[in-house]
A protein has these predicted regions:
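Intrinsically disordered, low-complexity acidic regions enriched in Pro/Ser/Thr
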Residues: 1-150
C-alpha cells in the first residue's frame, strides 16, 4: 500500500529582535504526519524547501521549479540522490544545517529513505525513526507540482 503525501503551509513568524525573517513555506505531510515535526526540523528553526507562492511569489518563482525537479524528473531511476527537505530560513545553505532524504524511483513509484540531518562539514546524523516511505508516482508528481504552481 502506497504512502500518501500532502503539502501543508508552514509559517515562520518573523521578528526584529533578534532579526528573523518571516517565511511561508510547505511542510511535507505523510499519511497525515508532519515531517517538520517528525524530523525535529521545528526544533532547529528550519523551514520547508518550497516557498509558498501565495505569500513568497518571488522566492517561489526563483527556486521552486528547481527543487521540484530534484524531487521528480531529475531523480535517477534505481540509484537516487539526496535532497534537502527542510533548510535554513534565512539562506537555505546546507552549511547552516538541513534535513535531507534519499529520493529514488522506479517506473511506478518514488521512495524517500535514509532521512538525516546534514551540514556538509560533520558526519550526517541519521534519523532512523522517520521513513522509509513509498509514493505512487502519479499522485506524488501532482502534489510536488502543486508547490511550483504560480
Amino acid at each position: 500500500m502506497a504512502d500518501h503525501l500532502e503539502l501543508a503551509t508552514l509559517h515562520r513568524i518573523g521578528s526584529t529582535d533578534p532579526l528573523k525573517r518571516e517565511r511561508y513555506t510547505f511542510d511535507f505531510m505523510v499519511n497525515g504526519v508532519s515531517l517538520f515535526e517528525a524530523t525535529q526540523a521545528s526544533m532547529s528553526d528550519m523551514c520547508g524547501c518550497f516557498s509558498d507562492p501565495r505569500f513568497e511569489h518571488e522566492l517561489a518563482h526563483r527556486f521552486n521549479f528547481r527543487i521540484a525537479s530534484m524531487l521528480t524528473s531529475d531523480v535517477p531511476v534505481c540509484t537516487g540522490h539526496r535532497v534537502a527537505l527542510f533548510v535554513c530560513p534565512e539562506c537555505s545553505d546546507l552549511a547552516c544545517g538541513a534535513i535531507t532524504v534519499r529520493v529514488s524511483r522506479n517506473e511506478l513509484s518514488v521512495q524517500w529513505s535514509d532521512f538525516a540531518y546534514e551540514n556538509g562539514y560533520e558526519a550526517e546524523s541519521k534519523l532512523d525513526s522517520v521513513g522509509p516511505f513509498e509514493f505512487e508516482w502519479g499522485a506524488y508528481l501532482t502534489e510536488i507540482r502543486r508547490a511550483s504552481a504560480e
